[in-house]
């Protein structure tokens, strides 16, 4: 049986989409490093945890986690070295059996300094918490 033009087009589009998803996943991996490996190592050498590590310890083990706004600040503030995730990590997760919004400043991004996008992301986290009747930590 011959392959139809629609099937060929579908497969072509599927391949393009898979490539785009993979590129997005790679970019997310970079963003999740915050200010970079060097700053993470510096934090660890001082006996401190990153924002994502602190959040992971706070949340119930095995519960679903949804990060919000991972690409906030992406491509912004290049003149200042960038602002991955807006300098703040926001997740919806479960703490002691209760779904919560958790916000943690990322000290690897400009030592935790705030950019305008940081404030916007914090406000959005508060709005999400209020709209969904979730406690915010």
Where do the language-model regions lie?
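Terminal-region recognition feature
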Residues: 1-137
């Amino acid at each position: 049986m011959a392959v139809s033009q629609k099937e060929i087009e579908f497969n072509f589009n599927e391949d393009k989409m898979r490539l785009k998803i993979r590129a997005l996943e790679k970019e997310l991996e970079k963003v999740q490093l915050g200010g970079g490996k060097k700053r993470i190592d510096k934090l660890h050498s001082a006996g401190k945890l990153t924002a994502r590590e602190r959040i992971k310890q706070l949340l119930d083990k095995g519960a679903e986690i949804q990060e919000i706004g991972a690409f906030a600040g992406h491509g912004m503030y290049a003149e200042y070295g960038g602002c991955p995730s807006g300098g703040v990590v926001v997740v919806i997760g479960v703490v002691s059996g209760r779904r919560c919004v958790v916000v943690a400043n990322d000290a690897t991004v400009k030592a935790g300094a705030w950019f305008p996008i940081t404030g916007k992301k914090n406000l959005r986290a508060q709005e999400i918490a209020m709209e969904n009747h979730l406690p915010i930590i």
